[in-house]
Amino acid sequence: MPANVAKGRTFTESARRAQIVAAAIAVINEHGYAAASFTRIAKQAGLSSTGMISYHFANKDDLIGEVLSEATTVAYNYISPRMEAATGYRAKLRARLESNIELVRAHPGHVRALMEIAQNAPKTPEFVDQRFGLFSGHLRAGQEAGEFGRFNPDAMAVAIIGAVDAMVIGLVHFPEVDAAEYGRELADTFDRATRPS
């Protein structure tokens, strides 16, 4: 079966792909994106050869794309219910920011993998663009609803993303820090920055 065939996979094939993706996440966490070779991933997964990876994934970019999909799905499933429970644009922005930071403690491996891929993989503009669009679109809609003040929503989105990423890096390096408290502080900061004057 060609590596890029997505439909008609057996349960065993799907399980093997999931095993390889989990191993790739572990290797990226331990060694970084650049050193995440098929050889290391095969060893981590307990596979007899790299050919078993190549059977399921056309190349490293194909595998990394699946890792990115898995990590973003985990993040979405964690953040989305918290946003849905909030009412109004300001409350939803707070929920998104707080849950983004708390995600570091809930799913540290997936967060580290996302960071490594976003910073080092050559083919991640779609992920970056989608993330930017989520924030800028939310801010723009909130302005139209009168819940946010006057500011450039694109510039504010860049500032928010930069602050989130910096805080995530800090939390990864300092595991003793209270992520929930940091999330509240971050949300407070941007609530003040975006509220109507």
Predicted regions mapped to residue ranges:
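N-terminal intrinsically disordered/low-complexity leader segments
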Residues: 1-15
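C-terminal peripheral helix-coil segments that are non-catalytic and often amphipathic
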Residues: 1-4, 102, 132-144, 163, ...
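Helix-turn-helix
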Residues: 19, 27, 31-62, 66
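Hydrophobic alpha-helical connector segments
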Residues: 66, 80-109, 156-160, 183
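Amphipathic alpha-helical packing segments from all-alpha helical-bundle domains
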Residues: 73-81, 106, 121-145, 154-158
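Short alpha-helical scaffolding segments that buttress acidic/His motifs in well-ordered protein cores
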Residues: 100, 114-118, 160, 164, ...
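Amphipathic alpha-helical segments used for helix-helix packing
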Residues: 101-122, 172
